[in-house]
Amino acid sequence: MAVFTVNGKTVTAEKNQKLLRFLRDELRLTSVKDGCSEGACGTCTVLIDGKPTKACVPQTDKLEGKNILTVEGLSDWEKKVYTWAFGEAGAVQCGFCIPGMVISAKALLDTNPDPSREEAAFAIRNNICRCTGYVKIIDAILLAAKCFREGKLPEAPVDWKVGSRVHRVDVEEKVTGTGQYPDDVYLDGMLYGSAVRSQYPRARVLAIHTEEAKALPGVVCVLTAADIPGINKVGHLKKDWDTMIAVGDITHYLGDAICLVAAKTPEALAQAKALVKVDYEELPAVHNPQEAILPDAPLVHREGNLLAHKHIQRGNPAEALAKSKYLITRRFSTPWTEHAFLEPECAVACPDGDGVLVLSTDQGAYDTQHEIMGMLGLPAEQVKVRNCLVGGGFGGKEDVTVQHHAALIAYLTKRPVKVKLTRAESLLIHPKRHPMEMEFSLGCDENGIIQGVAAECIADTGAYASLGGPVLERACTHGAGPYQYEAYEIDGWAYYTNNPPAGAFRGFGVTQTCFCIETLLNEMADKVGISPWEIRYRNAIRPGGVLPNGQIVDGSTGLVETLEAVKPYYDEAVKNGDPVGLACAMKNAGVGVGIPDTGRTRLTVRDGKLHIFAGASCIGQGLGTVLTQTVCGETGIPRENVVYERSNTWIAPDSGTTSGSRQTLFTGEACIRACQDLKKALEEHSLADLEGQEFYGEYLGKTDPLGADVPNPVSHIAYGYATQLCVLDKDTGRIKQMVAAHDVGKAVNPLSVEGQIEGGVVMSMGYALTERYPIDENCRPTVKFGTLGLFRANQIPEIKPIIVEKPGLNVGGGAIGIGEITSIPTAPAIAEAYRRYDGELRTELPLKNTPYAKK
């Protein structure tokens, strides 16, 4: 037992436990987030006697007489200052890390009221952010310091039209910790659920012994596949992922659920899981595509080890390469990568009539609903899904991980339940970025004009399909780069293995093939005798040009403008003798390739305010702010009369997944269309007169399938374009500056666009230099959150985001999403900078022999 002070009140911890658990579970101080429980991420940072401390580390028995402060304990003035500063700086995206950042900022400003930028970065070095790239968080700390020194608070922006730099609609709840993520939900009588996972990557389950676990006091149920009333398989495009492995069936990876346990307390849950005994027949595993392709390879799935094969061809690349003045062929290798979103997967489910209600953190509430409907055998009206706040996704929360398990327990026990992954489980279970082995050949004429490209790509898609097929397709369609030439051919294969699944990850396959084509272009520039900038400028796709996939691009194409935007920085680096690398990229907005892709929005007048409903997840990218600005700009309704509602499946229309950089364009266009009808109604009525009325907008983006025999195939509604460059310190070899110019069509909120650029750049700096997700001979990842190699605030260089607004797109207000493209060209730009630094051509990620390389 220990007695100490929390936020000015004396409290008693009767039993010894981690401070984090005491603050959250007993005091309900949910601003203190559980991001890892390993002392690594900083989301649980509190002040103990004025010192920032991770609450997941100390035990309560060691805190006798201590004074503890959480964000809830800040003064009203401090809360107002930090809310304004983080809003003004654009420092909030998913928000999961923000309360911990605020506490670290307070610790700094209490002792140093006028810190330098370097001091602010150092103060938050133990707080990881995966969204923002830290730049705007540091800006926010300096703004807060200025407010505290001057004792006054500036007004927030009042102009909410499209193009304004506004504070995001969710700033206050994320800064003060009042917004709810699923793990912040506590319900009366709530159970705690978790899965017993496979001990082997590939083994036949012979028997599951649950008797001892069921007999343990506090245990409510132990469920197996036999208890599932509907279908045991889930999966986005291919139903191959087992909800639980049935007796007699074979496991596919170590993350497979064997059974589900639900208990009244977390302690009873842990004890019960340990009492479940499973009999296995261990079987040989498939460790990589090279093994998967062998004629006598074990089958990961009955139908074979090949998930997908993609072949794309335009023109005759073999002939074009044979006639090329210069030809380069190289092999490339890119690794597994972990999303490392700060919020581990969590869902709360409870009975709802004859069905269930699920509070979820995901990238598509309707996708989650459909998976649960199939598993439970229920119609849509009996399965409701509502998004809480989502603590980051980056593609890693497109597949269900805990939602269906929570729904099953709640449905069968008629009790509310929380199912949450530990950080170790999260690292194992959700799909990662595909590792790929690639070979690219590039041919150019004497002027550096691309004549043709031929390529092959082999991807490890892991244990389940997830989105491996579309990822492979996108890697192939975009492997040609954003350049105009006619001869292109690529073959891609994705193979099942018994490794963790691979699926969607920011960049969606393009990150891998971009590394290849851009590295070859940099090498080719030397052969031709021109600069890497010049070879891109000569080949850049321009309005009216034809991409290697056959699509004629429209007037909104802004690649040349991004090249021109970085030219002064490139020339300055060359003049100063600083090693500099350059790379370009393009990325589609929307699903495309002939697949129906629809955005939908419903505007409802309630209590004199306009409520925005869109069934699209806001995972940190700022969709709620985009739609709010759209409504304010299109209708003239004041910001204070507009309410953005979180996604759900019973009022908000299905707007598709938050993926493919699609929501700003597709749901944004749907919102514009709904606003047009509302605006007409407002010509004759006040908003109050329209009480109870609804205004609906829908936009279907029509595209052509790959290989469509039409004169101008439209693979995608729109593309974003980018040029990034990396400048090294010529003495230390460390990155001095990253410059990122991105064509976004129209920046709805430039503040958010800059934040997306900065965050994407830092994420792919890690991809290029430091991040690792090693898997051992047992198909088990051997990392913890703290050893992933994520960049910290005091390690980032100057980042210069440049917004290019090329008009011409006639939907979505001209705006093109940039959630993915911001991290695509970063790695090849960095690789080229190091080639200029030491002459070594690097074709494998993470890059070797740099000051950042793991010793």
Regions found by a protein language model. Give the residues of each.
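Thiamine diphosphate
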Residues: 393-414, 418-419, 623
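Helix-loop-helix junctions that connect adjacent transmembrane helices in secondary transporters/permeases
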Residues: 294-376, 540-609, 689-714, 784-792
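Signature of N-terminal electron-transfer/Fe-S-associated modules in redox systems
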Residues: 1-155, 593
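Short beta-strand elements
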Residues: 46, 173, 179, 346-351, ...
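Flexible, low-hydrophobicity surface segments
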Residues: 145-307, 327, 412
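C-terminal catalytic domains of large/alpha subunits in multi-subunit enzymes
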Residues: 225-226, 377-382, 412-417, 446, ...
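Phosphate/diphosphate-binding loops
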Residues: 257, 263-265, 414-462, 669-688
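Glycine-rich loop/linker segments at domain edges
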Residues: 90, 164, 170-176, 305-347, ...
